[in-house]
A protein has these predicted regions:
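Dinucleotide-binding Rossmann-like beta1-alpha1 core, especially the glycine-rich loop
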Residues: 45-127
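Glycine-rich FAD pyrophosphate-binding loop
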Residues: 21-42
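Glycine-centered short loops/turns at secondary-structure junctions
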Residues: 8, 23-26, 164
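Flavin (FAD/FMN) cofactor-binding and adjacent substrate-gating region
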Residues: 89-168, 175-179
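Extreme N-terminal leader/targeting segments of oxidoreductases
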Residues: 1-4, 19-23
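Beta1/beta-strand and adjacent pyrophosphate-binding region of the FAD-binding site
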Residues: 1-12, 28
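Gly/Ala-rich phosphate-binding loop of Rossmann-like dinucleotide-binding domains
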Residues: 17, 21-22, 159-161
Length: 180
């Protein structure tokens, strides 16, 4: 009998199992294949704060994601690395000041400590602009992170097991019953 059961050994299943086991629950995590074999192994491998959600005024969501990104960077620096991205500006899409404002918020909503801040680029003079098409003259460079997603899943599952979770791989869940 378990206090909680997780079906699926991806990042969500392993992370929830780790959290539940860490709170003292008796937990079972079962995965039909191997850990991180499904959706988690096909991710974009970014630990990002959800920059695009600022456009929909999802400030709290972005703040929470940025805070968690910082937590992950501190907890697992051996598998999470900073990455810089160049975003060419196209005046037809939105004004440069609006993009810069969004990136300013992205830099500051989560209390960023480790990553460098956004900077405005002259794409014709800045080396970062070299691979960008000539039609773009202005851009922005901002930070996010890259993660070894499979290792993150496995580390969560191992920690869950160390906290008492029973982790079963190659074990499909064929039925479950909830008992009150």
């Amino acid at each position: 009998m378990y206090g909680g059961a997780g079906v699926g050994g991806g990042i969500n299943g392993a992370g929830i199992a780790r959290d539940a086991a860490g709170r003292g629950l008796s937990v079972l995590l079962c995965e039909k294949d191997d850990l991180a074999e499904g959706t988690s192994s096909h991710s974009g491998k970014l630990v990002h704060g959800g920059l695009r959600y600022l456009e929909y005024y999802e400030f709290r969501l972005v703040r929470e994601a940025l805070i968690e990104r910082e937590v992950l960077m501190n907890a697992a620096p051996h598998i999470i690395w900073p990455m810089r991205f160049v975003l060419p500006h196209s005046p037809e899409d939105r004004p440069a000041w609006l993009v810069r404002l969004g990136l300013f918020l992205y830099d500051h909503l989560g209390g960023r400590k480790k990553l460098p801040g956004t900077r405005t680029l002259n794409l014709r003079r800045d080396p970062e602009g070299a691979p960008i098409k000539d039609q773009y003259t202005k851009g922005f460079e901002y930070s996010d992170c890259w993660v070894d997603d499979a290792r993150l899943v496995v580390l969560n599952a191992v920690d869950a097991a160390e906290r008492g979770c029973e982790v079963l791989t190659r074990s499909p869940c064929v039925s479950a019953r909830r008992v009150n």
